[in-house]
Amino acid sequence: DAYTNLCHAVQSGQMDKTVIDTAVCRVLRMKFEMGLFEHPYVDPKIAAKTVRRKEHIELARKIAQSSITLLKNENSILPLSKMINKVAVIGPNADNRYNMLGDYTAPQEDSNVKTVLDGIITKLSPSRVEYVRGCAIRDTTVNEIEQAIEAARRSEVVIVVVGGSSARDFKTSYKETGAAVAEEGSVSDMECGEGFDRASLSLLGRQQELLESLQKTGKPLIVVYIEGRPLEKNWAS
């Protein structure tokens, strides 16, 4: 409702109209410099040849690899041996493509994005990997923690992928103001990105409960965070 309130602020004298004019001019100037007034639309044929070129994919992979930060490696558990017999891959971010991507990412083909689970299966094999979601990022009604515990007990090591999400629901409808219309009974994973503020740095939903339950199994536990904003990691450390 920011735009509606902005109109009220101008009408009531709380906001000077020149402030808005200045902000609008910046946007229009940039569009002019980019030639968007003369050529507002992209040529689909040119776009198809430009987007996802080999060198772009290689650069994106390099950036993603460089962004990974190892915070702790207790007992030198990493790197894992390729001879390991069974790995449990658990967590709401272990096999969710859009949760790995930033805000305003365009709709993607599944083949364009590899999840953590995809990568582990590639290195091992489907028969040596057991996946359970465990819980959602925010929705507390999603509870597969018991299934996750059982999978952990059957495995030699547990990789749990938690964190946050900037994933937008492309089926979401919007008000005239641009605000999303929330459907009753639905809780998206999105907790980061435009329009999302938080009062806590803790994991949301049942994620902390999932971590503590897996730790109690006594199996070696590797915790991976995929997040778009800083999250508290004191328990995991």
Question: Where in the sequence are the language-model features?
Answer:
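C-terminal non-catalytic regions of proteins with extracellular/luminal or membrane-system context
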Residues: 1-17, 29, 58-237
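Conserved, charged catalytic cores of large soluble enzymes
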Residues: 25, 29-32, 36-49
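A broad, low-specificity signal for short, low-complexity segments enriched in glycine/proline
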Residues: 46-50, 182-185
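Metal- or metallocofactor-binding catalytic centers and their adjacent structured scaffolds
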Residues: 52, 56
